[in-house]
Regions:
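Hydrophobic alpha-helical membrane-association signature
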Residues: 23, 50, 152, 203-206, ...
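Structural beta-alpha unit
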Residues: 1-5, 46, 56-93, 100-101, ...
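Gly/Ser-rich helix-loop-strand patches that form or flank binding pockets
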Residues: 82-132, 237-289
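Short boundary motifs at domain starts and secondary-structure transition points
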Residues: 1-4, 128-135
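A conditional alpha-helix N-cap/helix-loop micro-motif detector
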Residues: 20, 74, 105, 149, ...
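A short acidic, glycine-rich active-site loop
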Residues: 190-202
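Small/aliphatic-rich secondary-structure junction motif
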Residues: 2-53, 60-65, 138-192, 212-217, ...
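General small-molecule cofactor/ligand-binding pocket signal
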Residues: 39-41, 69-73, 124, 169-171, ...
Length: 289
């Protein structure tokens, strides 16, 4: 089974805004932690003034200059960033994001969230409470019953060790519909309770197997939680309630579009109201964009 780590090439989009310097410093810190090359993507015309300003900003980060590529692009921001990621074989794209989108921005989509919906490399969304500026203590990772989950959990463990995280919780969201319908009498209530108990036992055994596989990678202390609830919404609420520093989830099986926001996809619940920094893990670096 191929894994997307180690992250050898990371990228971030850089704009000349009040947040540019902070974004660059966050990205260079991550690049140094990973011993990775850094691609700085600027969507806009290349001018001597911009080149000079970028060179000054890079020099102030302390990163080795030969590990940084500045890539100027023209055109649509999202398309240009994704094309750069593909051409430069980026493993991890870093973007900043507001924790909560208003209704209009949710339906039209910010650039960061569009990248999450359309990207084909792993993506790290940094919120105002960044895992880089602050100590990373708790990581929550999706334990979905899906072929992608093992790699996602292993990636969370790999990145957690880089960040110096203290604990990982694998959260398995069980859709209540799979555990039986609402009971109308005592007999149905007992049958539903029994079905849910058996289902939880099966899921506990599956997650335990994941934990055993993590031991081979040298795992951070890990625990798991099985929760009956709406997928996406439940894990986001759990991460917020338990003050997680980083939430790690599977990538969507296909690019998300407007209909996924109208009829909410699992990931859209999290993107609409980020509980913390978010990493979306894509499985194969050969399909980057």
């Amino acid at each position: 089974m191929s894994v997307p780590f180690p992250f050898k090439t990371i990228a971030t989009a850089i704009a000349f805004s009040p947040y540019a310097e902070a974004n660059l410093h966050e990205s260079t810190r991550i690049a140094k932690m990973l011993d990775a090359n850094l691609v700085l993507i600027h969507v806009g015309a290349k001018t001597p003034e911009k080149v000079e300003q970028l060179e000054l900003m890079i020099s102030q980060t302390g990163i080795e200059r030969n590990k940084v590529l500045v890539d100027f692009r023209d055109g649509d921001a999202v398309k240009s960033i994704l094309e750069s990621c593909k051409e430069n074989k980026v493993n991890l794209l870093i973007a900043g994001a507001m924790k909560k989108e208003n209704l209009i921005r949710f339906y039209t989509g910010s650039i960061a969230r569009k990248l999450c919906r359309k990207g084909r490399c792993s993506i790290l969304l940094l919120t105002d409470r960044s895992v880089i500026r602050n100590k990373c203590r708790e990581i929550v990772v999706s334990g979905d019953n899906h072929d992608k989950t093992e790699v996602t959990v292993r990636t969370a463990n790999y990145f957690g060790k880089i960040l110096g995280a203290e604990h990982i919780t694998i959260v398995d969201e069980i859709d209540p519909k799979t555990g039986g319908n609402a009971a109308d009498d005592d007999a149905e209530l007992e049958a539903t309770a029994h079905k849910r108990k058996e289902l939880k036992k099966q899921e506990d055994e599956r997650i335990a197997q994941l934990e055993n596989k993590l031991e081979k990678d040298g795992s951070i202390p890990v625990g798991h939680k099985c929760i009956f609830g709406k997928p996406g919404y439940t894990i986001g609420h759990y991460a917020a309630a338990n003050k997680a520093d980083l939430l790690v989830m599977n990538s969507p099986d296909s690019s998300l579009g407007l209909m996924d926001r109208v009829f909410t996809h699992d990931l859209e619940y999290v993107l609409s109201d980020l509980p913390c920094c978010l990493m979306i893990v894509h499985q194969n670096e050969k399909t980057v964009a």
